[in-house]
From Swiss-Prot:
The lineage of its organism: Bacteria, Bacillati, Bacillota, Bacilli, Bacillales. This is Urease subunit alpha. One of its GO terms (biological process) is urea catabolic process. It comes from Geobacillus kaustophilus (strain HTA426). Ni(2+) 2 binds at K219, H248, H274. InterPro entries: Amidohydro-rel, Metal-dep_hydrolase_composite, Metal_Hydrolase, Urease_alpha_N_dom, Urease_alpha_subunit, Urease_AS, Urease_asu, Urease_asu_c.
Length: 569
């Protein structure tokens, strides 16, 4: 017997469906659901008098062999692969299936079997994204990890050894001993982690030994001397071992200008950190490197988006992070050369047109580790407010823009650092790192952060209350953040050379260990929704930025979305 209900009633019960639109937080961004993989009339829902009961939505005979370990029901998935509604089945810590969950004895189209061994997360009315990948981490303090996790970041790539002066300025874990100790420290955290070694040496062996020790990539930083010889040696090692190189170029142009750096790179793939220049790099025209096919460009979140306070904040920030002395005129000039309103304004637009491919934090070293996702969506909203819908949009929503921006902190950094086989998207076979959001809090405060198929962080009320919701509701670590569960639900990434040398056994690592790879053949064309290669020029006198001969600029925002109304308490 059929039953008719209004869209409003349906959305309230099972969540929105195909053609429905959802507003993201308090922004002007809307998503339109492109497809619904659940089956009308056979939807699953947990609760008293609901569907997921023995012999109904739950298969009465299915053992663990047939059933999934966890199912997220009626989720709206926001991913580079699409914006759609589906159930998500998780088994052995991986995404086993996406589609229709339930009992195939009674229901049509079931590809996710719910049984007695299945846990349920009710995701109707919620948005699910892949866990974020922050590929610009200074590992200055371990408390960064819980801050990042509670914001929806589940993978951190960078370098450091704690609050050492070198780490405060550069993302390097230098040398075998330091790499080993940091790999051991990573065992304690419910976070996927990969470390970058120091790439600043003009000979290969001091660099190569760090890759063999476990570094998944190398960092070239001007504070260690990013000379042409160091760039070439580092990239030769990277080509040999199939790892990525991240570069922070020479702000002062002491060793050469941007053209000399490009000549030293010589067409080899490289990840350019804070390509906008405010975080460092050839002044004033580092951003022109984003024109080239071998450059995978990212920028960091303090300049995201450009607001009326951005310039004032950056000067003091820069002085501290790079160990500069405000009483030394040359140090002041160094700082001033980086902070340019014209290039920061252009950065907004270069992200919006897909010329800049990634956004990361630069944690505690001119960046906020818990605001990568927040500032990504603030940038997207500012661009829509100032320039309207993208011309590529076809439906009622902002789906193209949303896919472009979600890719900046999920799939693209995963591709760049050779880990997209494991993380970075909501796809079958990938590690089940998922973030559940209420639409009103999307991008600001997640409800649940799932690591490897188990809840690692959540908003949780008073533990002494009779129900989970009474105040104070705070972010608290959940069971995947404790004990041996950490090792089963989080990944340590290593170079293939270290993996094959048996470094995990040598150090007694218990976390899941995965090798990185498929890096050295990458080009900007591999940056999903963010592969625009345009001619970018910066006027050396006025700092004005032109793209294909056209001036690009925008006004600073006076007010941003996703801000004070969410952070009163």
């Amino acid at each position: 017997m059929s039953f008719s209900m209004s869209r409003r009633q349906y959305a309230d019960m099972f969540g929105p469906t195909t053609g429905d639109c959802i507003r993201l937080a308090d922004t002007d961004l809307w998503i339109e659901i492109e497809h619904d993989y659940t089956v009308y009339g056979d939807e699953v829902k947990f609760g008293g008098g609901k569907v997921i009961r023995d012999g109904m939505g739950q298969h009465p005979l299915a053992t663990r062999d047939e059933a999934v370990d966890l199912v997220l029901t009626n989720a709206v998935i926001v991913d580079y692969t699409g914006i759609y509604k589906a159930d998500i089945g998780i088994k052995d810590g991986n995404i086993a299936a996406i589609g229709k969950a339930g009992n195939p004895l009674l229901m049509d189209g079931v590809n996710i079997v719910i049984g007695a061994s299945t846990e349920v997360i009710a995701a109707e009315g919620k948005i699910v994204t892949a866990g974020g990948v922050d590929a610009h981490i200074h590992f200055i303090c371990p408390q960064q990890i819980e801050t990042a996790l509670s914001s929806g970041i589940t993978t951190m790539i960078g370098g450091g050894t704690g609050p050492a002066t070198g780490t405060n300025a550069t993302t390097c874990t230098p040398g075998e001993w330091n790499i080993y100790r940091m790999l051991e420290a990573a065992e304690a955290f419910p976070m996927n982690i990969g470390f970058l070694g120091k790439g600043n040496a003009s000979a290969k062996e001091p660099i190569a030994e760090q890759v063999r020790a476990g570094a998944i990539g190398l960092k070239l930083h001007e504070d260690w001397g990013t000379t042409a010889a160091a760039i070439d040696a580092c990239l030769r090692v990277a080509d040999e071992y199939d790892v990525q190189v991240a570069i922070h170029t020479d702000t002062l142009n002491e060793g050469g200008f941007v053209e000399h750096t490009l000549k030293a790179i010589n067409g080899r793939v490289i990840h350019t950190y804070h390509t906008e220049g405010a975080g460092g790099g050839h002044a004033p025209d580092i951003m022109k490197v984003a024109s080239f096919p071998n450059i995978l460009p990212s920028s960091t979140n303090p300049t995201r988006p450009y607001t009326k306070n951005t310039l004032d904040e950056h000067l003091d920030m820069l002085m501290v992070c790079h160990h500069l002395d405000p009483s030394v005129p040359e140090d002041i000039a160094f700082a001033d050369s980086r902070i340019r309103k014209e290039t920061i304004a252009a950065e907004d637009i270069l992200h919006d047109i897909g010329a800049f491919s990634m956004i990361s934090s630069d944690s505690q070293a001119m960046g906020r580790v818990g605001e990568v996702i927040l500032r990504t969506w603030q940038t997207a909203d500012k661009m829509k407010k100032q320039f309207g819908r993208l011309p590529e949009e076809t439906g009622r929503g902002d789906n193209v823009r949303v896919k472009r921006y979600v890719a900046k902190y999920t799939i693209n950094p995963a591709i760049t650092h050779g880990i997209a086989e494991y993380v970075g998207s909501v796809e079958v076979g990938k590690f089940a790192d998922l973030v559940v959001w209420h639409p009103a809090f999307f991008g600001v405060k997640p409800e649940l952060v799932i690591k490897g198929g188990m809840i690692a962080y959540s908003v949780m009320g008073d533990p002494n209350a009779s129900i989970p919701t009474p105040q104070p509701a705070l972010y608290r670590p959940m069971f995947a953040s404790y004990g041996a569960a950490i090792a089963k639900t989080s990944i340590t990434f290593l170079s293939k050379a270290a993996f094959e040398r048996g470094i995990p056994d040598k150090l007694g690592l218990h976390k899941i260990v995965k090798p990185v790879g498929n890096i050295r053949s990458l080009t900007k064309n591999d940056m999903v929704f963010n592969n625009a290669m345009l001619q970018i020029d910066v006027d050396p006198q006025t700092y004005e930025v032109k793209v294909d001969g056209r001036l690009i600029t925008c006004e600073p925002a006076e007010v941003v979305a996703m801000a004070q109304r969410y952070f009163l308490f």
